């Protein structure tokens, strides 16, 4: 199913009927929303309030009262202000339907319907006139979601400035989504404390969004708070089953497997991951399969079952094996533990020659090389460098 953007317009009535409806909408719309929209347009265009006041032949305080919602803005005033800002206001976009579109995109994100989600986002981006309408803040919330979820290197600072001006007009569900995406942004920056603050704000507005609980369990897993992680995994699984979100359910169960692994329940971790591996093959989910196999290689290492470790490693697609330095590390350790030092050093050399390798892995692999060469002092220096890298 693809969301039909034609439904965001207020209808196809004859022009006189449309004008009447536009007038009614304009009269009934929240003055604060209009004020925030006009202010955010002015801020985005970097236009001083003095210039707006001069063009409208009113005082700056009058413009300020319009922007704060103390005074209502007529359609004529809206048009004049937008004209000064170099845009024209679109009165046809139905904000309620755009709110539904925000929820629809977020649902697709929750369900891992990535292609469908991105297709809808692209349609929104192609209709940039929405950015100067009653649904302006929904438009920028969608752009912000796109920037963070897809990590597309887009500068989201402008989106955030606009959304901070307009968030007071959001529904509770929109606010919950907004703060959840802010939390996700901080998660990508490894700022778990700030991410948790935003997640707490998100759940104040809606405590039943699947991704809110999923993000909680991911953070607590990373922090080592396993009791809390288990609490949110269970809640996430409960919501996923209720919403029939089977794609996301697989990744939730993957988190459960990581929790078993982190609490040294290796048999449970292996059994769950093997069941998920079977499911990933049925669904032809290559990325899920790669995540599961990575876990199984690590489980095999920790259980000292090196034969299984090599078996699972051979099942990993080569494209992932070259880019995932955790897997590269597992492969080196497998050869190291079976005393195949020649191959271990070969893979270390290959990794160190890769320009994309990070400082942590570079130091760690050099440490392993020095250990193989029985150069313990240099190995210790490299390990200390690893810790320094983590601290910085």
PLM region descriptions:
Residues 1-44:
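A short, Lys/Arg-rich alpha-helix, primarily the initiator
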Residues 121-128, 160-168, 197-205, 234-245, ...:
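Amphipathic alpha-helical segments of tetratricopeptide repeats
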Residues 74-91:
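DNA major-groove recognition helix of helix-turn-helix/homeodomain DNA-binding modules
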Residues 45-65:
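Short alpha-helical DNA-recognition segment
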């Amino acid at each position: 199913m693809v969301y039909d953007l034609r439904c965001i317009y207020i209808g196809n009535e004859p022009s006189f009927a449309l004008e009447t409806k536009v007038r009614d909408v304009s009269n009934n719309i929240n003055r604060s929303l209009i004020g925030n929209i006009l202010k955010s347009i002015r801020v985005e265009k970097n236009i001083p309030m003095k210039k707006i006041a001069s063009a409208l032949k009113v005082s700056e305080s009058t413009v300020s009262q319009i922007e704060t919602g103390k005074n209502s803005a007529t359609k004529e005033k809206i048009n004049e202000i937008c004209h000064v800002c170099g845009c024209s206001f679109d009165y046809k976009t139905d904000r309620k339907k755009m709110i539904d579109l925000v929820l629809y995109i977020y649902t697709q994100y929750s369900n891992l319907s990535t292609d469908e989600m991105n297709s809808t986002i692209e349609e929104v981006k192609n209709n940039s006139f929405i950015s100067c309408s009653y649904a302006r803040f929904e438009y920028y919330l969608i752009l912000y979601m796109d920037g963070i979820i897809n990590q597309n290197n887009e500068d989201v600072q402008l989106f955030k400035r606009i959304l901070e001006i307009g968030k007071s007009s959001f529904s509770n569900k929109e606010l919950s989504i907004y703060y959840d995406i802010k939390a996700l942004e901080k998660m990508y920056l490894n700022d778990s404390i700030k991410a948790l603050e935003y997640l707490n704000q998100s759940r104040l507005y809606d405590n039943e969004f699947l991704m809110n609980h999923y993000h909680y369990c991911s953070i607590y897993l990373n922090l080592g708070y396993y009791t809390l992680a288990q609490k949110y995994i269970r809640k996430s699984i409960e919501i996923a089953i209720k919403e029939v979100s089977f794609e996301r359910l697989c990744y939730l169960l993957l988190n459960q497997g990581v929790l078993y692994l982190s609490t040294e329940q290796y048999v449970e971790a292996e059994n769950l991951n093997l069941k998920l591996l079977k499911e990933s093959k049925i669904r032809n989910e290559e990325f899920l399969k790669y995540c599961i196999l990575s876990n199984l290689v690590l489980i095999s290492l920790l259980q000292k079952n090196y034969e299984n470790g090599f078996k699972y490693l051979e099942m990993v697609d080569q494209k992932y094996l070259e880019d995932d330095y955790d897997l590269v590390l597992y492969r080196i350790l497998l050869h190291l533990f079976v005393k195949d030092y020649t191959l271990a050093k070969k893979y270390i050399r290959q990794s160190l020659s890769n320009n994309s390798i990070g400082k942590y892995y570079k130091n760690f692999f050099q440490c392993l090389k020095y250990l193989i060469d029985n150069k313990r002092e240099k190995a210790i220096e490299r390990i200390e460098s690893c810790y320094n890298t983590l601290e910085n």
